[in-house]
From Swiss-Prot:
GO biological process terms on file: mRNA pseudouridine synthesis; tRNA pseudouridine synthesis
Encoding gene per record: truB
Annotated InterPro entries: PsdUridine_synth_cat_dom_sf, PsdUridine_synth_N, PUA-like_sf, PUA_sf, tRNA_psdUridine_synth_TruB, tRNA_sdUridine_synth_fam1_C, TruB_C
Organism in which the protein naturally occurs: Saccharophagus degradans (strain 2-40 / ATCC 43961 / DSM 17024)
Listed Gene3D superfamilies: Pseudouridine synthase, PUA domain
Record-given protein name: tRNA pseudouridine synthase B
SUPFAM superfamilies found in the cross-reference section: Pseudouridine synthase, PUA domain-like
A Pfam family the protein falls into: TruB_C_2
């Protein structure tokens, strides 16, 4: 038997969804995929069900570049709640301990936050998708099993206190700009532990993921309303071009002859590559007409070697 053809349209591009609270990232992905009647789609990094905000969804060729988005920096706006410890480190979990936080001040929070700016080693929460012996940690946590987790290096570039509301259960609104793999829930619980009050995430909104911002996003409800009973093609004007997924990489325009060989998986020589980056750096590759061919890596021989290629029709 031959390969079964995927149902749906062979579209390519990216759309930035404003994920609603309460939905899983995969659930949102499947709804968007159905709305566009796409044959291939994937998201670029899960958000907790409690979280809202930027969830880039890639279609077709754009899925080949999703790993680059997974590796990108992120920005979040969150509300940390002090005086309560939960089993999930967010407000979806069960409160395990309550401590009077009425003496907590804004100055205390500012001082605690400052200790987490820069390169830090962070212990991931048990309620996470990280795996131990092939099993997600959150599944172990649901069974009441807690295992030791190794600290992982992450970077918090910016950590800003936006507002502070004192009380027996105090709240702090914060903005965090951080590297991939940073758990905002761990920041909340770790800072709460430092303050000897306990802490968890009450609200979480991702406002940026790589080159994508919340201003570029659209809700599922808006897409559903626009499509109505019409064909999926009416939504295609929302699609961003495939190469925007790697917009942070410098671009290189090849002549038609070099583009031909590059599109067939061959490394090609170009004297301009070292002006774009160093050995191992990535570049976006286009032909002379501006057509996107994929992502290449600069080699020590002055060539660009294909890493991810888009389909050429």
């Amino acid at each position: 038997m031959g390969n079964r053809k995927r149902p749906g349209r062979p579209i390519s591009g990216v759309i930035v969804i404003d994920k609603p609270a309460g939905d899983s990232s995969n659930g949102v992905l499947q709804r968007v995929k159905r709305l566009f009647f796409a044959n291939k789609a994937g998201h670029t990094g899960s958000l907790d069900p409690l979280a809202t905000g930027v969830l880039p969804v890639c279609f077709g060729d754009a899925t080949k570049f999703s790993q680059f988005l997974l590796d990108s920096d992120k920005e979040y706006v969150s509300t940390f709640r002090f005086g309560e410890v939960t089993d999930t480190a967010d407000s979806d979990g069960e409160v395990l301990e309550s401590i009077d936080a009425s003496k907590l001040t804004k100055a205390d929070v500012l001082k605690a936050i400052k200790a987490y700016i820069g390169d830090i080693d962070q212990v991931p929460p048990m309620y996470s998708a990280l795996k131990r012996n092939g099993q997600p940690l959150y599944k172990l946590a649901r069974q009441g099993i807690e295992v030791e987790r190794e600290p992982r290096p992450v970077t918090v570039y910016e950590f800003e206190l936006l507002a502070f509301r004192p009380g027996a259960v105090a709240e702090a609104d914060v903005r965090v700009f951080c590297s991939k793999g940073t758990y905002i829930r761990s920041l909340a619980s770790d800072i709460g532990a430092d303050l000897e009050l306990g802490g968890h995430v009450a609200k979480l909104r991702r406002t940026q993921a790589g080159p994508f911002t919340i201003d570029q996003s659209i809700t599922i409800e808006e897409l559903e309303q626009e499509r109505g009973e019409r064909l999926a093609e009416v939504l295609d004007h929302h699609l961003l071009p495939t190469d925007i997924a790697v917009a942070d990489f410098p671009s290189l325009e090849l002549d038609d002859n070099s583009a031909f060989y590059f599109s067939r998986g061959q490394a090609v020589m170009d004297s301009r590559v070292y002006r774009l980056g160093d050995e191992g750096d990535k570049v976006r590759v286009f032909d002379s007409s501006g057509k996107f061919y994929g992502v290449a890596e600069i080699t020590d021989e002055g060539t660009v070697a294909p890493k991810r290629l888009v389909s050429q029709s």
